[in-house]
Amino acid sequence: MIKSELVQRIAEHNPHLYQRDVENIVNAILEEIVAALARGDRVELRGFGAFSVKHRPARAGRNPRTGAHVPVDQKSVPFFKTGKEMRERLNRDHPDPGAAD
């Protein structure tokens, strides 16, 4: 699902809201999450999950084509950890196909 499909679904489930308003709300929520992460804050949505930033140290990489060693700078990457309720719902709705019956 892409963002426009999410906006459309929310608008369909909430006919009292205009689709443009839903789009503005979704954009505002996503922008606030990004801004909080950029400030170094953790964003927790109870039952859904938590967004945070992980810091990866600089390291020595390798070009797979040439084999040459390449320095890789340190960087910050977004990280999402699912909440307990989400994990339980996903596992309840989609049991492990490899598990014995």
UniProtKB/Swiss-Prot annotation:
One example GO MF annotation: DNA binding
Transmembrane segments: none
SUPFAM superfamilies: IHF-like DNA-binding proteins
Region (Disordered): 57-101
Domain of life, per lineage: Bacteria
GO cellular component terms, A-Z: chromosome; cytosol
Keywords tagged on the record: DNA recombination, DNA-binding, Transcription, Transcription regulation, Translation regulation
Record keyword Transcription regulation present: yes
Comp. bias (Basic and acidic residues): 82-101
GO annotation terms (biological process): DNA recombination; regulation of DNA-templated transcription; regulation of translation
Record InterPro entries: Hist_DNA-bd (IPR000119), Histone-like_DNA-bd_CS (IPR020816), IHF-like_DNA-bd_dom_sf (IPR010992), IHF_beta (IPR005685)
The keyword Ion transport appears for this protein: no
NCBIfam families registered for this protein in UniProt: hip, PRK00199.1
PANTHER family: DNA-BINDING PROTEIN HU (PTHR33175), INTEGRATION HOST FACTOR SUBUNIT BETA (PTHR33175:SF5)
Biological role: This protein is one of the two subunits of integration host factor, a specific DNA-binding protein that functions in genetic recombination as well as in transcriptional and translational control.
Subunit structure: Heterodimer of an alpha and a beta chain.
Family membership: Belongs to the bacterial histone-like protein family.
HAMAP family, per the entry: IHF_beta (MF_00381)
Name this polypeptide is given: Integration host factor subunit beta
Organism: Bradyrhizobium diazoefficiens (strain JCM 10833 / BCRC 13528 / IAM 13628 / NBRC 14792 / USDA 110)
GN (gene name): ihfB
